[in-house]
């Protein structure tokens, strides 16, 4: 895998608060190599390590995107949901930003059935099929459609398991991470000072609570994916 320059700036990361970890009492000792200091009861992440692993992750997604691989971005906390959707749409990735439904990947056949139902209902709605049904039946199907849109809207075009999964919060998305591990799907994960750095294929030490931090990391990854995709389009 070729190493590239991704304009990862330590000052920019500091301004975004990427270096702020959790309180010193709430930490995982495995994170010690990624922590540079303690300040006012808070662990401070070593941004040099962050830059290194973020650069590795950008290289990985660029390489994968240039070969037409598919990505899934997962981040379901309310405050990060919009950023996850925006990043995914910008890079033409699939995403889950409301709730991870258990078995979404490990029980793919069930997910696929739900997606077929979702697509059928969307088609019925667009062609006016629902309006021709009795009111009670139409109302029930519209509720189903709304539910499916909420939880599966970000993966409605997914036709198979993703090649790489990007996870915004290890603790919040632990079930998703475990499903990826079970299936052998490579993962890139933001890890705060209370996380386990050994679980993901590439762990990026960063503040996973501040929106500014999450956006910065996602922006870099999305830019790398877009760059890779443009190369794939030029040389299919």
From Swiss-Prot:
- Biological process annotations from GO: translation
Q: Name one GO cellular component term.
A: small ribosomal subunit
Which keywords, in A-to-Z order, does the entry hold?
Chloroplast, Plastid, Ribonucleoprotein, Ribosomal protein
The main location is plastid
Where does it reside?
Plastid, Chloroplast
Q: Name the domain of life.
A: Eukaryota
Record's keyword annotation contains Chloroplast: yes
The GO molecular function terms of this record are: structural constituent of ribosome
Family according to the record: Belongs to the universal ribosomal protein uS2 family.
Q: Know the name of this protein?
A: Small ribosomal subunit protein uS2c
């Amino acid at each position: 895998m070729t190493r590239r320059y991704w304009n990862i700036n330590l000052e920019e990361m500091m301004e975004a608060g990427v270096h702020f970890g959790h309180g010193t009492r709430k930490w995982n000792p495995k994170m010690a190599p990624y922590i540079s200091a303690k300040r006012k009861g808070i662990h401070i992440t070593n941004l040099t390590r962050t830059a290194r692993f973020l650069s590795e992750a950008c290289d990985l997604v660029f390489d994968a995107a240039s070969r037409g691989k598919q990505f899934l971005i997962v981040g379901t906390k309310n405050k990060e949901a919009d950023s996850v959707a925006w990043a995914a749409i910008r890079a033409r990735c699939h995403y889950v930003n409301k709730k991870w439904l258990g078995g979404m990947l490990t029980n793919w056949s069930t997910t696929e059935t739900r997606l077929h139902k979702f697509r059928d209902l969307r088609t019925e709605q667009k062609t006016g099929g629902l309006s021709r049904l009795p009111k009670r039946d139409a109302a029930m199907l519209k509720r189903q459609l709304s539910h499916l849109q909420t939880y599966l809207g970000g993966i409605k075009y997914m036709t198979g398991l993703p090649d790489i999964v990007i996870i915004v919060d290890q603790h919040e998305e632990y079930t998703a991470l475990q499903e990826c591990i079970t299936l052998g799907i490579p993962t890139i994960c933001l890890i705060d000072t209370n996380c386990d750095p050994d679980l993901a294929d590439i762990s990026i030490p960063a503040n996973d609570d501040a929106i500014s931090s999450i956006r910065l990391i996602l922006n870099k990854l999305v830019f790398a994916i877009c760059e890779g995709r443009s190369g794939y389009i030029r040389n299919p």
